């Protein structure tokens, strides 16, 4: 059995299927791990969701910022933008079933037997692994419960940008969501920045990647994430895997296979501007 981790798909369904064929992914024996942002910007978010949902327990996916935004659009919280290419999904007969499935995806996923943790954007430098787990479960329970509409209506915003253990209510939940789904850079005091989307070498002075700000512990799991296409898979750390390589921007879609540490990519020139 192989554990195959894939970066942001963003509706690039044909590229996903081509990559899985290239990696000889076998849904009867292997497990597909997806770093979130299944939808938006690419041409076929609908079939991407249908395919991943259809894999059942052979697929594990975490929520990304575009996935949460889709839920907000469907609930009337946010406008449907033409550039997101979600109209077909919004009009699909199985729309509600797909969105209900998506709403129940986690913010953080872990392998039950292997030292691997997966999120969409990252883990706050202020958190250890245990805090990250607990924070993820807090917001997941809201998304899956009766308060999910309230959460979708109030999740947008950049504040607070710093963590305190005594944060409560929507400020706490917004920080948790932003950390797991939007974060790239931090200031040296740990505050989150949401403006700079470039790579570390081109970043604004005073910022550093969130994974450079985190303390490393010997027993930390391998951390797999997506979201940050400008990294092009480069973190400089063996135990931190960045898998968003900008498929929807015309670069490539990348798969990392845990068992043999193989990186497999397929070019996606169709989407190049």
UniProtKB/Swiss-Prot annotation:
E.C. numbers: 3.6.1.41
Superkingdom of this protein's organism: Bacteria
Pfam families: Metallophos
Catalytic activity, as annotated: P(1),P(4)-bis(5'-adenosyl) tetraphosphate + H2O = 2 ADP + 2 H(+)
Gene3D superfamilies recorded: 3.60.21.10
Enzyme class: hydrolase
Entry's Gene Ontology molecular function annotations: bis(5'-nucleosyl)-tetraphosphatase (symmetrical) activity
Keyword list, A-Z: Hydrolase
InterPro entries, per the entry: ApaH, Calcineurin-like_PHP_ApaH, Metallo-depent_PP-like
General function of this protein: Hydrolyzes diadenosine 5',5'''-P1,P4-tetraphosphate to yield ADP.
NCBIfam families (UniProt xref): apaH, PRK00166.1
PANTHER family found in the cross-reference section: CYTOCHROME C5, PTHR40942
Family, per entry: Belongs to the Ap4A hydrolase family.
Listed name of the protein: Bis(5'-nucleosyl)-tetraphosphatase, symmetrical
Gene source species: Aeromonas hydrophila subsp. hydrophila (strain ATCC 7966 / DSM 30187 / BCRC 13018 / CCUG 14551 / JCM 1027 / KCTC 2358 / NCIMB 9240 / NCTC 8049)
């Amino acid at each position: 059995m192989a554990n195959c981790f894939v970066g942001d798909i963003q509706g690039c369904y044909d590229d996903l299927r081509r990559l899985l064929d290239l990696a000889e992914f076998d849904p009867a024996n292997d497990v597909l791990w997806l770093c979130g942002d299944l939808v938006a910007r690419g041409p076929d978010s609908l079939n991407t969701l249908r395919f991943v949902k259809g894999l059942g327990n052979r697929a594990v996916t975490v929520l990304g910022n575009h996935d949460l935004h889709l839920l907000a659009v469907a609930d009337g919280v946010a406008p449907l933008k033409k550039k997101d290419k979600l109209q077909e999904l919004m009009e699909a007969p199985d729309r509600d079933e797909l969105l209900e499935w998506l709403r129940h995806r986690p913010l953080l996923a872990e392998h039950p037997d292997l030292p691997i943790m997966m999120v969409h954007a990252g883990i706050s430098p202020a958190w250890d692994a245990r805090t990250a787990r607990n924070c993820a479960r807090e917001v997941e329970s809201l998304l899956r419960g009766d308060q999910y509409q309230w959460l979708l209506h109030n999740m947008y915003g950049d504040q607070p940008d710093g963590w305190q253990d005594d944060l409560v209510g929507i400020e706490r939940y917004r920080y948790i969501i932003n950390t797991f789904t939007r974060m790239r850079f931090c200031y040296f005091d740990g505050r989150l920045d949401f403006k700079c989307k470039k790579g570390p070498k081109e970043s604004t002075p005073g910022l550093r990647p969130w994974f450079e700000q985190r303390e490393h512990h010997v027993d930390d799991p391998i951390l797999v994430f997506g979201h940050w296409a400008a990294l092009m898979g480069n973190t400089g750390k063996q135990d931190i895997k960045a898998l968003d390589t900008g498929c929807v921007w015309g670069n490539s879609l990348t798969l990392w296979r845990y068992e043999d540490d193989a990186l497999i990519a397929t070019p996606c020139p169709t989407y190049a501007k």
